[in-house]
Design a protein with these regions (language model features):
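Solvent-exposed functional surfaces
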Residues: 1-149
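Acidic, carboxylate-rich catalytic segments that either coordinate divalent cations
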Residues: 137-176
Length: 176
């Protein structure tokens, strides 16, 4: 899929701090995993209307629609760039290992990325003041059994599981 929104995804997939927060293997780089993660961030944080437990189809349709939308509303490019950058800086400040499971982790599990990235964005959307806060309390739940359960790969693409993991992070960040 080529178009102005896809160009933005490719651009953002190469930026810091994202590439440092979300390490992927050489194979993952070759398979454009960073672009996949950026695309999932936007697709899932924009809402899951039309999602039917088939991420590839949902994401394809999302990017196709956004390419058309950005072509007629080019100002959206900067809005989406800011949204992504803001979220990555927030994750860098709030989550000690970024999207990794541990400090020395060399991989970014998709379910973990979705939970943290999308959950953070949803929390920021509800309470923009989070961007100015210093959050020190994530380690307690980040390393807990509940977070491990919601980010497990079992049925990870089911919409209920996707909502559960993104909602888990959103609610913890909002103190719900």
């Amino acid at each position: 899929l080529i178009g102005p929104f896809m160009d933005l995804i490719i651009e953002l997939a190469l930026t810091k701090p994202f590439t440092e927060l979300a390490p992927v293997s050489k194979k993952g780089l070759d398979e454009r995993e960073h672009e996949e993660l950026v695309t999932r961030f936007f697709a899932y944080s924009d809402g899951l209307e039309g999602y039917r437990d088939r991420p590839s189809e949902f994401i394809f349709n999302y990017v196709k629609g956004m390419n058309e939308k950005v072509a007629t509303q080019p100002e959206l490019t900067e809005q989406y760039r800011i949204r992504f950058t803001e979220t990555m800086v927030f994750v860098e400040n709030a989550f000690p290992y970024g999207f990794r499971r541990s400090q020395k982790g060399k991989a970014t599990p998709r379910a973990r990325f979705e939970a943290i990235a999308v959950g953070s964005r949803l929390a920021i959307d509800q309470n923009p003041a989070l961007l100015q806060q210093n959050l020190h309390n994530v380690a307690g739940w980040l390393d807990g059994d509940d977070f491990a359960r919601v980010t497990g790969s079992d049925g990870a693409n089911a919409i209920a599981r996707l909502r559960e993991r993104t909602g888990f992070v959103r609610d913890r960040l909002l103190g719900v």
